[in-house]
Amino acid sequence: HNYDTMSFTHQGATWIGDGFANKDHFDDEIRNAIKEHMDYCKAYEERTGRKVWISEWGVYQGIADKEDISAYVDYFSNVCKELEIAYCYWEFCSGYGIYDLTAGTFKDFVINYFH
């Protein structure tokens, strides 16, 4: 799993409490955290010969701006692609989802930014 930084990826999540209730924006601090952790994963792969798979990542869509979510998805998936680290976005049609079950459509602001 990777949810760097949780103050951004979990903002507005009802199960966390008030700690992440403030609106946060995707910025260089978050970019740097993602890059640092993915570089660490790549170094681990190279050192051990074991592949890393980020089995869960995403942004809770409670109060985050769609533009910030798009930028996060774009950046995170691009870093993974550049470093050849496999990933799986969390999840299909709930709080982090790529699909709007009520509308019966994919969320362009998420799905269009995968690399």
Residue positions per predicted region:
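Aromatic-rich peripheral "rim/lid" segments of glycoside hydrolase catalytic domains that contact
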Residues: 63-115
